[in-house]
């Protein structure tokens, strides 16, 4: 059960499960299904199996079930990884972070159901689950990197790219928070057209300000990632890890901008909104991978 041969498929399945947790949370918010089980948690309408199954109850129950299964899968993964590749420096802290933040995510979700938190607190939920996802994602990448098909272990990232990548990570996380706040504050269609309502640029409500703030953050995120991408491919032309990694990040942020614009133009089409959540999830995951490589470079500086 905890054999080393299980590591790769466990990593892939756990990463996919955590992806579904992210998408499930976005689906719950987008469809207004957060109250699908009333104010009961972990029960649903005070029962293990509710009497009726309207669509909002099905969505909320499905999200809870996937979250519970993902916790079990992540526990299986981290125990197996700790046992067999715990000698790799990042495995143990990533294991603790992945489980800890997954539990914290569940507690915040439960608190939201029971005590009806305000929008600004609820917006933290997606960001916390994103940290847990990224930890599982990194464990999986480490497992596959043991084969040494890429030169990531020998990669040395210099200070300019390190600074840009740290800035990129911070800005992305701020963008994630404002995006989650847009969903929770019901501001997806606020502040008129995209990119700006040129007939009336002045925000007139809290929702307008939330939406405008997110658009400004999205523009900053795109700009920072574009600058970082250009710097990376220009200064590390022969390193596949940097070249492919930062190219993937730039493609993901382009897709993120496109789906964000289409969400507004289509009056928040559900499928487009879910892709919007998917792209930012993997963009942040890629960024944490760059940070892990950077920290290895910092350690090599000290040695």
Curated annotation (Swiss-Prot):
Heme o binds at residues 63, 125. Pathway: Porphyrin-containing compound metabolism; heme A biosynthesis; heme A from heme O: step 1/1. It catalyses: Fe(II)-heme o + 2 A + H2O = Fe(II)-heme a + 2 AH2. One of its GO terms (cellular component) is plasma membrane. Residues 1-8, 89-93, 147-163, 237-244, 292-303 are cytoplasmic. It is a multi-pass membrane protein. Disulfide bonds join 37-44. It comes from the Bacteria. Its EC number is 1.17.99.9. It is found in: Cell membrane. GO terms for biological process: heme A biosynthetic process. Heme b binds at residues 214, 276. Catalyzes the conversion of heme O to heme A by two successive hydroxylations of the methyl group at C8. The first hydroxylation forms heme I, the second hydroxylation results in an unstable dihydroxymethyl group, which spontaneously dehydrates, resulting in the formyl group of heme A. GO terms for molecular function: metal ion binding; oxidoreductase activity, acting on NAD(P)H, heme protein as acceptor. It holds the Pfam family COX15-CtaA. This is Heme A synthase. InterPro entries: COX15/CtaA_fam, COX15/CtaA_HemeA_synthase, HemeA_Synthase_type1. The N-half (TM1-TM4) and C-half (TM5-TM8) domains are connected by an intracellular loop. Each domain is formed from four-helix bundles and they align in a pseudo twofold symmetry manner. The N-half domain is the substrate-heme O binding domain and the C-half domain is the cofactor heme B binding domain. The cysteines of disulfide bond Cys-37 and Cys-44 may be involved in transfer of reducing equivalents from quinol in the membrane to the active site of the enzyme. The active site is at residue 60. Residues 30-67, 115-125, 185-215, 266-270 are extracellular. Interacts with CtaB. Its cofactor is heme b. The chain crosses the membrane at residues 9-29, 68-88, 94-114, 126-146, 164-184, 216-236, 245-265, 271-291.
């Amino acid at each position: 059960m905890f054999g080393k041969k299980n590591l790769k498929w466990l990593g892939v399945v756990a990463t996919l499960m955590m992806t579904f947790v992210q998408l499930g949370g976005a689906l719950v918010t987008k469809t207004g299904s957060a109250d699908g089980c009333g104010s009961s948690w972990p029960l649903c309408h005070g029962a293990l199996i509710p009497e009726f199954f309207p669509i909002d109850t099905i969505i909320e129950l499905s999200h809870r079930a996937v979250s519970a299964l993902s916790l079990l899968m992540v526990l299986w993964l981290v125990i197996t990884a700790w046992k067999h590749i715990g000698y790799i420096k990042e495995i143990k802290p990533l294991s603790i972070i992945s489980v800890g933040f997954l539990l914290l995510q569940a507690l915040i979700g439960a608190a939201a159901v029971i005590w009806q938190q305000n929008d600004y607190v609820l917006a933290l939920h997606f960001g916390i689950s994103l940290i847990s996802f990224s930890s599982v994602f990194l464990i999986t990448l480490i497992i596959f990197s043991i084969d040494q098909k890429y030169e990531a272990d020998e990669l040395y990232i210099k200070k300019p790219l390190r600074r840009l990548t740290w800035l990129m990570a911070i800005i992305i996380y701020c963008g994630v928070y404002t995006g989650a706040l847009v969903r929770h504050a019901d501001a997806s269609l606020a502040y008129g057209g995209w990119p700006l309502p040129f007939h009336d640029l002045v925000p007139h409500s809290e929702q307008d300000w939330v939406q405008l703030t997110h658009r400004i953050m999205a523009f900053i995120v795109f700009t920072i990632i574009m600058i970082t991408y250009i710097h990376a491919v220009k200064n590390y032309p022969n390193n596949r890890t940097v070249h492919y990694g930062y190219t993937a990040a730039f493609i993901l942020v382009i897709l993120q901008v496109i789906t964000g614009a289409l969400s507004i133009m289509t009056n928040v089409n559900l499928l487009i909104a879910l892709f919007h959540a998917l792209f930012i999830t993997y963009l942040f995951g890629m960024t944490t991978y760059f940070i892990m490589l950077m920290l290895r470079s910092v350690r090599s500086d000290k040695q």
